[in-house]
């Protein structure tokens, strides 16, 4: 029986997971977020965990958060919050661009290539404070004008400077600043990969608004629920969904366990709540019931595809989209429901060949090909043929809808110098391929170690409370990475696990359950506690105390 090392506020040290006991001392992590407080919405639990596992984390804010509040105030709040999560002040960078909203007046730096944008705070170039100059000034002793080219240049410089093993970023949220960061981060990663094919970071992205800041306010101190899938029209301020499109497939999301200090009985003791409290100017602590869940959600992308190193020729259309790392793009980041544009190779309708040829100067190995199609309800590729230079050929019948990926496992094909994609038939004219990822290996070895987590009705279980009348509970196991076979066992009492269900013995009041792989390197431990109806209600009284605490904090912050 393993005991937790994270026991400051964990009254049940048995409740633990191998995820919290890794050594990431040699792992370099780079987090990009738009605003001071997005570090919490984007990755609070993951940051806190890997910081305690000694990862080196560099935190980058692209804007100064200066829409209504002075940058100096936002900087100090960010430094304090990052410190709570375990990120030292010297590891924080400020790019210094202006904080904006969705305005539809083309004032955002996203639209400015030649002439600088003017921010809402009145600035036209990057700036910081005396203690924390903007990144451009730190590197070049001069500020950068507010243009999209400089924004991209700064992203590229930071990625090249840190050469992080893991890059984390906010994804395509509703906010214009979030959208620009998501698009330009993908663009920058694609460019860096072409410059240096040996650099192959993991890319993790997360929606900060629908999965945290604007998520369902469903926190409970008893069996706190998992992060819910956002729904347009139901989730707060959620007017457009990219989830379900491209690689954002809900069932393929990565779910991170939450550390003990983010699962406390009261908000006052919760490490994430303490980090939120540092952002006084934003009053974001009042949204804590939306932010806290039993898991933290991400989507992952590989960057080790050899297609980035290939020269591409196409029979017609723009072939540069096929290996730029961007599976989608928009030209208007302000619209509530943006239109995907400039992201696909679309051969001309009258083109008789409709082919794209990937050619390598040095032979490569091909084991898997992943294709992303265009998003269209009426236009699609019906048949497509893939041919490799060694004679391998495979015809596939149609790409999935919504730009979702199609995986073609070729088996190990060696000494490949060309890969040809040929569209054989299609419906309509607005079809295309947004990205072609060609891999030399079917699997990818992640820096984040494999882990497992016991699920009860799709919820990550830790200390799980049930009514004494419950006799059977469904038990499943979530796994990340190559864990091998996971076995569930009851470590005390007379309850038994059979066919994915826990059959509870009347004599058991606390049931200790362990999930573990054969090697013992991946494991999870939970406790199921049986309570009477009255005791369950009494247990939930802490929720009332938390609501009173939040109500008082709202009143206090309003008058500050």
At which residue positions do the language-model features occur?
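Trp- and acidic/polar-enriched beta-sheet ligand-binding modules for extracellular glycan
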Residues: 350-352, 364, 375-444
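Extracellular/luminal low-complexity segments enriched in Ser/Thr/Pro
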Residues: 497-507, 512
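Disordered, acidic Ser/Thr/Pro-rich linker "stalks" and the adjacent N-terminal cap
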Residues: 300-366, 374-381, 435-449
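Active-site beta-strand->loop->alpha-helix modules in alpha/beta enzyme cores, enriched
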Residues: 2-198
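C-terminal accessory domains and tails appended to enzymatic cores
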Residues: 6-15, 104-111, 123-142, 154-157, ...
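Solvent-exposed, low-complexity, repeat-rich "mucin-like" stalks and linkers
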Residues: 450-484, 541-546
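Edge beta-strands of extracellular beta-sandwich domains
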Residues: 522-530
């Amino acid at each position: 029986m393993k005991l937790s090392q994270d026991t400051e506020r964990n009254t049940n040290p048995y409740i633990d997971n191998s995820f919290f006991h890794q050594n990431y001392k040699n792992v370099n992590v780079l987090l990009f977020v738009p605003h001071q407080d997005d570090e919490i919405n984007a990755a609070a639990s993951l940051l806190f965990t890997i910081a305690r596992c000694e990862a080196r984390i560099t935190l980058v804010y692209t804007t100064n958060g200066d829409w209504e509040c002075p940058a100096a105030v936002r900087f100090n709040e960010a430094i304090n919050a990052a410190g709570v999560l375990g990120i030292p002040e010297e590891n924080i960078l400020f790019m210094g661009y202006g904080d904006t909203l969705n305005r539809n007046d083309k004032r955002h730096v996203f639209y400015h290539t030649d002439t600088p944008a003017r921010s809402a705070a009145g600035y036209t170039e990057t700036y910081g404070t005396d203690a924390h100059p903007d990144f451009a000034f730190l590197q070049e002793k001069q500020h950068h004008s507010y243009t999209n080219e400089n924004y991209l240049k700064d992203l590229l410089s930071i990625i090249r400077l840190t050469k992080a093993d893991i890059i984390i970023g906010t994804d395509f949220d509703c906010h214009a600043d979030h959208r620009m960061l998501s698009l330009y981060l993908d663009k920058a990663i694609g460019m860096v990969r072409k410059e240096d094919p040996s650099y192959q970071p993991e890319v993790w992205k997360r929606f900060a608004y629908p999965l945290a800041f604007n998520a369902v306010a469903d926190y409970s101190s008893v069996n706190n629920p998992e992060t819910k899938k956002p729904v347009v029209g139901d989730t707060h301020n959620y007017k457009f969904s990219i989830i379900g499109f491209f690689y954002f497939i809900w069932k393929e999301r990565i779910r991170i366990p939450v550390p003990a200090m983010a699962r406390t009985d009261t908000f006052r003791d919760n490490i994430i709540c303490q980090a939120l409290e540092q952002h006084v100017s934003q009053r974001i602590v009042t949204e804590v019931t939306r932010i806290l869940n039993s898991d933290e959600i991400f989507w992952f992308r590989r960057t080790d595809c050899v297609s980035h190193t290939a020269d591409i020729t196409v029979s017609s259309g723009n072939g540069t989209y096929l290996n730029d790392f961007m599976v989608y793009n928009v030209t208007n980041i302000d619209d509530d429901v943006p239109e995907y544009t400039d992201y696909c190779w679309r051969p001309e309708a009258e083109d008789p060949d409709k082919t794209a040829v990937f050619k390598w100067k040095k032979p490569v190995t091909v084991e898997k090909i992943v294709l992303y199609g265009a998003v269209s309800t009426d236009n699609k590729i019906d048949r497509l043929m893939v041919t490799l230079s060694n004679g391998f050929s495979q015809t596939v019948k149609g790409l999935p809808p919504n730009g979702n990926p199609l995986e073609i496992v070729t088996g190990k094909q060696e000494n490949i110098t060309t890969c040809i994609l040929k569209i054989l038939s299609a419906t309509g004219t607005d079809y295309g391929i947004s990205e072609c990822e060609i891999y030399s290996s079917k699997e990818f070895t992640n820096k984040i170690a494999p882990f497992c987590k016991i699920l009860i009705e799709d919820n990550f279980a830790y200390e799980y409370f049930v009514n004494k009348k419950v006799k059977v509970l469904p038990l499943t196991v979530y796994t990340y990475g190559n864990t091998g076979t996971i076995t569930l066992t009851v470590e005390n009492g007379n309850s038994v696990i059979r066919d994915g269900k826990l059959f509870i013995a009347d004599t058991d009041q606390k049931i200790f359950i362990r999930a573990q792989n054969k090697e013992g390197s991946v494991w999870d431990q939970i406790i199921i506690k049986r309570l009477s109806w009255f005791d369950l209600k009494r247990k939930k009284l802490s929720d009332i105390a938390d609501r009173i605490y939040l109500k008082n904090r709202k009143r206090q912050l309003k008058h500050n």
